[in-house]
Amino acid sequence: MPLVNGRFVADMKSPRTPDNEEPAAERACDFRPVDKGFTEEMALAEAERCLNCKKPFCVEGCPVNINIPRFIEQIREKDFGGALDTIREDSMLPAICGRVCPQENQCEGKCIRGKKSEPVAIGQLERFLGDRPELASTPVSYTHLTLPT
């Protein structure tokens, strides 16, 4: 990725990484999830597409204000544990939000890349990390929670 004015800049021509879906013939025979989520290689390729904007509108589009540029940069650096920790600073549900959050109207809807081409697949990157809790440098503790009586 080229360095311009002290910032890494992505190639605008790189296409969005397609979803990792079960082939139709296979999914017709079972009840496994259709979308298998990104592999590590797919996540790294998609993270390279981030423009590292000076004013990250994607964060403004996120209802919980996740530091999206930082976690994508950490994915790019293969610091998956750090990326998951970054998300968990604001959201403890990356695996769920990566699947059900309406990213097309929120973070991805605000992505600058989406003005000229397809936005970065922020939801898929979040899901990639959320599906791998063992990568976190700090394990999640729920001991502080109390059940209602």
State where each predicted segment sits.
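Ferredoxin-type iron-sulfur electron-transfer modules and their immediate structural context
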Residues: 1-141
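Conserved small/polar residues in nucleotide/adenosyl-binding loops
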Residues: 143-149
